[in-house]
């Protein structure tokens, strides 16, 4: 999916994060209990979301595919620092994970990476909004609710992937 992205900020920042954290990204669970709580769960969760997003981006031309893909790939990457995954089986929350959370942690990481890439404009703000809004509602842990179509889509795809995998696990 990254190869389908047009050259520019979103592709550059995604490539920078994947290059830096590739091993952790592909082996880390997406959660400790609720969904994708298994080895490589984070990568599977992201892949499921990207597959569905591709259909929506084809269907709705107003969507910025690069922003959607970048938002999906990075939305839970803060979990690499929110939870430990020492033995690839059990996860525990780090102190920073408990006190700050993966959303705030990822926004800080995007700020740092954007500075390194020398791109801190509107695209960076939109990407941070994707991260901040992906839980959808304030009461579900989002500091802001989605304010653009791309953020709304990422929120719903996050919910669908999480719920379907939880149901699939329950029925096994």
Question: Model-predicted segments: where are they?
Answer:
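Acidic/His-rich, divalent-metal-binding segments that scaffold phosphate/diphosphate chemistry
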Residues: 1-97, 137
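Divalent metal-dependent catalytic cores for phosphoryl transfer on phosphate-bearing substrates
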Residues: 55-170
């Amino acid at each position: 999916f990254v190869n389908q992205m047009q050259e520019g900020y979103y592709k550059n920042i995604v490539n920078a994060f994947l290059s830096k954290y590739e091993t952790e990204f592909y082996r880390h669970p997406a959660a400790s209990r609720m969904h994708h709580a298994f080895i490589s769960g984070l990568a599977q969760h992201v892949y499921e979301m990207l597959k569905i997003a591709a259909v929506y981006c084809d269907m709705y031309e107003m969507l910025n595919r690069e922003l959607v893909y970048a938002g999906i790939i990075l939305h839970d990457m803060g979990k690499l620092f929110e939870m430990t995954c020492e033995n690839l089986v059990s996860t525990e929350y780090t102190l920073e994970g408990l006190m700050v959370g993966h959303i705030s942690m990822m926004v800080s990481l995007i700020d740092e990476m954007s500075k390194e890439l020398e791109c801190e404009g509107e695209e960076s703000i939109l990407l941070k909004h994707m991260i901040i809004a992906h839980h959808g509602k304030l009461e579900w842990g989002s500091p802001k609710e989605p304010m653009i179509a791309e953020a709304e889509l990422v929120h719903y795809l996050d919910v669908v992937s999480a719920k379907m995998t939880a149901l699939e696990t329950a029925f096994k």
